[in-house]
C-alpha cells in the first residue's frame, strides 16, 4: 500500500466514524425524548393540550380525506378553541388567510420560518406558526428553546440539542416564527396535521405573501432514513445556513401555481435533502 492510498483510507475511516457517531447521537436523543414543558414567552414555543375535540378531529380528518380543504379552512379558522389559543398571545392577534395541510412527509432540516421578524424588513411584531395535530405522534416537533430571542445565539450549536415535543391528536403547538425548529422522523410518514400563521394586523402588509395562501404537502421523501437522520443532525448544528436562504424562500413561497419562480439553487437543495427538485413547490389546495 502506498503512502498516498494510506492517507485516503484514513480519511474514509474518519468519515465512517463520523457518520456512525452522528447517528448514535441522533438515536440517543430520540430514545431520551420526553414531553416538553415550555412556554411561548420564555422558550418561544408552547404545547396546548386537547384543544380540538374528538368529534372535530374525526370531522376534519374526513374533510382532508375527501379534499374539502376550503371547508376545512373555514371551520378551523372559526373554531372557538383555536381562536382562544390565538388570543392568548394578545387580543389583537389574528389568524392569517393561510392554511397548509400536511398529509405526508416533514421538513427534517432545522430552520426558522419565513414570517419571523428576523427576515422581514418593517415587521413590527412577532409572528407565530400554529400546528394542529389530527393524529397522535410519538414526536411532533423538534425545537431549540430560546433560539427565537437572537438570530446569532444559536447560529451554531455544537453542544445544544434539539428537544422533541410529544403530542396527541387534538393538541396544538404554537411557536415564534424566529424559533429554530425541525420536523421529526417518526415510524409513519403520513401523520396528518395542519399549519396556520398567527400575526398582528399591523404586519399583514409586510407578510402579504402568506395571505390567500392555501397549500397541501402530500409527497414522499425519497432519501433513505439514515441519510435524513444525518441531514437533520448537521442542519441543527448549523442552522445559520438556513438563515442565508430566507430571502429566496420568501420570494418563492407562493409556488409556481401562483407565478413564483423556483431558483436552480432551491431545486438543488430540495433534491439533495428531499429526493425531488419540486419538494417545496407545493400545489394550491383550492
PLM regions with names:
Residues 73-78, 97-107:
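Short, glycine/charge-rich beta-strand/loop segments that flank catalytic centers
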Residues 90-100, 142-143:
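A short coil-to-beta-strand element that immediately follows conserved catalytic motifs
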Residues 52-54, 101-102, 135-138, 148-149, ...:
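Short, solvent-exposed loop/turn segments at secondary-structure junctions
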Residues 1-3:
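N-terminal Lys/Arg-rich, disordered targeting/topogenic segments
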Residues 106-167, 206-214:
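Catalytic core of non-heme Fe(II) oxygenases with the double-stranded beta-helix
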Residues 6-93, 168, 227-286:
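N-terminal auxiliary "cap/dimerization" subdomain that precedes the catalytic jelly-roll/cupin core
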Residues 150-286:
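Conserved double-stranded beta-helix
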Residues 97-100, 130-132, 196-200:
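A structural signal for short, well-ordered beta-strand segments
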Amino acid at each position: 500500500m502506498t503512502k498516498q492510498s494510506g492517507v485516503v483510507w484514513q480519511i474514509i475511516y474518519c468519515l465512517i466514524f463520523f457518520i456512525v457517531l452522528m447517528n448514535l447521537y441522533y438515536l440517543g436523543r430520540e430514545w431520551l425524548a420526553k414531553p416538553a414543558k415550555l412556554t411561548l414567552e420564555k422558550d418561544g414555543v408552547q404545547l396546548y393540550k386537547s384543544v380540538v375535540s374528538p368529534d372535530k378531529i374525526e370531522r376534519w380528518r374526513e374533510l382532508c380525506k375527501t379534499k374539502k380543504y376550503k371547508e376545512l379552512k373555514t371551520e378551523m379558522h372559526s373554531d372557538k378553541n383555536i381562536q382562544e389559543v390565538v388570543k392568548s398571545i394578545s387580543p389583537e392577534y389574528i389568524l392569517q388567510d393561510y392554511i397548509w395541510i400536511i398529509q405526508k412527509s416533514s421538513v427534517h432540516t432545522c430552520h426558522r420560518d419565513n414570517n419571523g421578524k428576523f427576515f422581514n424588513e418593517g415587521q413590527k411584531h412577532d409572528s407565530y406558526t400554529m400546528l394542529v395535530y389530527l393524529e397522535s405522534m410519538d414526536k411532533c416537533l423538534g425545537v431549540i428553546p430560546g433560539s427565537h430571542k437572537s438570530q446569532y445565539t444559536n447560529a451554531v450549536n455544537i453542544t445544544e440539542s434539539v428537544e422533541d415535543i410529544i403530542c396527541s391528536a387534538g393538541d396544538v403547538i404554537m411557536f415564534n416564527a424566529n424559533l429554530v425548529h425541525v420536523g421529526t422522523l417518526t415510524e409513519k410518514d403520513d401523520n396528518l396535521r395542519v399549519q396556520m400563521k398567527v400575526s398582528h394586523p399591523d404586519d399583514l402588509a409586510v407578510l402579504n405573501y402568506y395571505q390567500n395562501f392555501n397549500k397541501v404537502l402530500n409527497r414522499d421523501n425519497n432519501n433513505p432514513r439514515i441519510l435524513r437522520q444525518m441531514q437533520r443532525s448537521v442542519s441543527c448544528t448549523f442552522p445559520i445556513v438556513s438563515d442565508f436562504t430566507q430571502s429566496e424562500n420568501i420570494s418563492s413561497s407562493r409556488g409556481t401555481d401562483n407565478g413564483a419562480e423556483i431558483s436552480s439553487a432551491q431545486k438543488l437543495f430540495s433534491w439533495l435533502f428531499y429526493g425531488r427538485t419540486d419538494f417545496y413547490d407545493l400545489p394550491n389546495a383550492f
